[in-house]
Amino acid sequence: MRGSNNTDLFDPKTEMDSNFSRHGSSSEGDFGFAFNDSNFSDRLLRIEILGGPSDSRSDAEGCTSIADWARHRKRRREDNKKDNGVAISDIVACAEEQILTDNNQPDMDDAPGGDNLDDEGEAMVEEALSGDDDASSEPNWGIDCSTVVRVKELHISSPILAAKSPFFYKLFSNGMRESEQRHVTLRISAQEEGALMELLNFMYSNSLSVTTAPALLDVLMAADKFEVASCMRYCSRLLRNMPMTPDSALLYLELPSSVLMAEAVQPLTDAAKQFLASRYKDITKFHDEVMALPLAGIEAILSSDDLQIASEDAVYDFVLKWARGQYSSLEDRREILGSRLALYIRFPYMTCRKLKKVLTCSDFEHEVASKQVLEALFFKAEAPHRQRILAAEGSDSMNRRFIERAYKYRPVKVVEFELPRPQCVVYLDLKREECAGLFPSGRVYSQAFHLGGQGFFLSAHCNMDQQSSFHCFGLFLGMQEKGAVSFGVDYEFAARDKSTKEEYVSKYKGNYTFTGGKAVGYRNLFGIPWTSFIAEDSQHFINGILHLRAELTIKRSSDLH
């Protein structure tokens, strides 16, 4: 009777879910001794291998690197599509596997001797391509699918395969007559043969004999096709432990969109992102390489907090340059910037001068630019503790726009006045760790700020006090532009102090006539040794932050005489 004795091996909702959620295979039983052994098997798996001699090599054969594997796979896929319409071996884009029956054949129950045919009947499984649900018709692959170049028969245990794979579980427990038949036929392309044999062996032994990256990728793709998540995770782990290259990392980034079970390869994808972010953290050092990277690689680099770059303004400029180089169409550029790359630019840490330029940049849709600039300005207007809260809230999410990167030039807050004289107040905050890292002779620069059309910057130093011969903390004010420009400025340095209820206390005042490239300041801003300045009980760090302020006022022409 059809389906009368088809009892589930186990409840799929509980047992299989727990099995597929495991992240390793070491704790699972080793049934390698039962592989292809009739004594421990209840079915016979017939593997029909299709294709001609040109199709006999797998993607991994002859490949010495990931790049070779990717090129081989891409070339074969394109050749098959060009010559045959559809690639039989394209397991990346395969549709759901279906059981094929022939509706024109008589019902087996009505056939002569039907009661005795269960052991001899076969369930045939092959790819159902192009979404056609009519499984009774032979799919047209553009090659002679009736040509079976090889046949392999294996003794299999349906409980072992079903426990590892929802594909085989459905095949063996779907209530149809085929699930009760002892013979099951799989029809595959010649390129898949080696990977499938490795996969079947893994389902018994939880181990693989292949060790190269191309071969592991073949097995991983086969595991995805036959829904063996544990094997995908195993391959992913082995690939993560191998030396990575830019080519392999970029290939791994594409896996989630190329496989059905993307979660199984997520750790490998994350490792690829970390590799690219670490390798290209100084994008100026690898400028040409980075400019040639695809979108996924650029996103991996821009997502890093450790990007070694002068400022977020420089990140913005780089993104625009890359987008213009990759997308000649303004419409395409706006689409990719608005929907993808804008998410990785941390607009709240851009200078106001650059944010103004964002609003008039034709590469961004006006609505996108306005939204990003308004959000950035609101963030800048928040109190420091609110900014820290916003940054903490975004630290676990994909969108890290409120988190400050490790910029080469430290961000500053600037308040500008035009009357009664051009003036600006500049706030620079330094973490205790940043200050500690300056010892014994380091320096850190602020981002540029502007007054009277001239660019200025602050720099914090660890100096040797020339009079007392000990290290100390110094602060300097410099002008960017070099040349014969003469610029008179009144300045004042101040810092917050615990002893004065955390108010800003003036440290030094002075005036200086700048010429391009010159700087003025104080080698020992606090008048104490470095050890006292950096000590745990230091009065100058409030919640681990050193708060500095500089006021600059342009001298009137009458003041210069």
Swiss-Prot record:
Residues 143-212 form the BTB domain. SMART domains: BACK, BTB. Gene3D superfamilies: 1.25.40.420, Apoptosis, Tumor Necrosis Factor Receptor Associated Protein 2, Chain A, Potassium Channel Kv1.1, Chain A. InterPro entries: BACK, BTB/POZ_dom, POB1-like, SKP1/BTB/POZ_sf, TRAF-like. Residues 107-119 have a biased composition (Acidic residues). The BTB/POZ domain mediates the interaction with some component of ubiquitin ligase complexes. This is BTB/POZ domain-containing protein At2g46260. It comes from Arabidopsis thaliana (Mouse-ear cress). The lineage of its organism: Eukaryota, Viridiplantae, Streptophyta, Embryophyta, Tracheophyta.
